[in-house]
């Protein structure tokens, strides 16, 4: 799921960059085509019988959302997994939304360099997700989350260290960028940030599903999406405030990298298996 999600995001952002400056009606047509494609694709999803067919739908969105979140908090493992997943989206939102400006200012690159960095980030997440699943061998191993958080922290700090002294005025192409010796450590670190993001998120998604009962699982996923959205909006607000006050993407990336530390402490306090206790086999 992680792999597919970020590959889709990668293609979407590359396509968005490619169509910048084209007439608005072309953008509108592309959006409609993507929407139609998603709708058609959903028709091929296998049908699954409802596990809680008697669930009443609350038509008041605000009241229904509050009720769902209140119910989710009572399930400690589910809520803990949701907070961890939402932090992953918080980090991802900060990196990807600020990456175009970061590429211009600190790497001196144009849109093609941005697309390269975004591709490396997405490839890293896909590779990390696949390897984490392979290493887990069909078991839930929450210790990989701690490994991922450690990697995100270290690589985030290294990225800031590698680029904080760079400040470019003009924009250069991808061949110029690849001719710079300092570019390769930056590319490697960006890939590793995505890689450890995959290790961080995959066990949490597994835990979310295995910790939920069959009758509550769909509602747990819904609650997860709501909290994910709240965290991503919070990421946008934090980014706007810090950039307004300090005008420094490096500072923003530094704070996000260090933010993995209190998040890890929170997760470990709520579940000791994040320190490497015995794994449990996934439910079929």
Descriptions of predicted regions:
Residues 1-276, 280-283:
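Alpha-helical transmembrane-bundle signature of multi-pass membrane transport and export proteins
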């Amino acid at each position: 799921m992680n792999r597919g999600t970020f590959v889709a995001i990668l293609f979407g952002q590359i396509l968005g960059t490619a169509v910048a400056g084209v007439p608005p009606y072309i953008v509108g047509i592309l959006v409609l085509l993507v929407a139609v494609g998603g709708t058609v694709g959903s028709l091929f999803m296998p049908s699954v019988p409802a596990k809680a067919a008697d669930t009443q739908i609350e038509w008041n969105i605000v009241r229904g959302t509050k009720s769902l979140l209140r119910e989710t908090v009572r399930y400690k493992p589910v809520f803990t997994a949701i907070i961890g997943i939402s932090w992953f989206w918080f980090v991802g939102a900060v990196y990807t939304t600020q990456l175009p400006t970061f590429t211009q200012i600190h790497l001196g690159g144009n849109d093609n360099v941005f697309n390269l960095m975004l591709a490396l980030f997405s490839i890293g997440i896909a590779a990390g997700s696949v390897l984490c699943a392979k290493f887990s061998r069909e078991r839930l191993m929450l210790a990989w989350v701690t490994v991922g958080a450690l990697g995100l922290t270290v690589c985030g700090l290294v990225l800031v260290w590698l680029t904080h002294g760079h400040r470019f005025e003009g924009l250069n192409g991808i061949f110029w960028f690849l001719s710079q010796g300092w570019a390769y450590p930056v590319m490697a670190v960006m890939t590793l940030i995505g890689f450890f993001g995959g290790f961080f998120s995959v066990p949490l998604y597994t835990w979310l599903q295995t910790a939920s009962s069959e009758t509550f699982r769909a509602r747990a996923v819904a609650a997860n999406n709501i909290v994910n959205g709240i965290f991503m909006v919070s990421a946008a607000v934090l980014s706007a405030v810090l950039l307004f006050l300090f005008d420094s993407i490096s500072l923003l990336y530094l704070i996000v990298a260090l933010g993995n530390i209190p998040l890890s402490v929170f997760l470990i306090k709520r579940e000791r298996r994040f320190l490497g206790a015995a794994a449990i086999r996934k439910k079929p």
